[in-house]
């Protein structure tokens, strides 16, 4: 059974493990340019975990940690948040866990946090992630052109029905 639960300090090393042996582009792809810098460290994770309007979650498959996903920019006035820094360990990819995790996070956001809208960014080249997000009900809303076209990205959105 898949569950999405709030991260605890004992989980911080998991993020390091899932990035072990990966390069700077890998970190940039899943974490973006602002929060974590290569190489990712416990200090960076601790600092980020304490940020207001943000929540890091661990994805569990039968109590085994297989990934992490975050809600940030949680806004109780606009009833919205942004999904970001979504990572699955290598042996959990291509098994449907990403879609299941997103559906769990959507339930948390809408039922527990009282939100109505979620957004996320995804790089245009990341077809596997785009398909995962679409399976969970997200729609492409906007294209963003960057100077380095490799990092062009979409905004995707999920609204409460």
Predicted features by range, described:
Residues 6-12, 16-93, 104-108, 112-113, ...:
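Acetyl-CoA-dependent GNAT
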Residues 81, 116-130, 135-161:
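C-terminal "cap" of GNAT-fold acetyltransferases
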Residues 89-103, 123-131, 135:
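Conserved glycine-rich acetyl-CoA-binding loop
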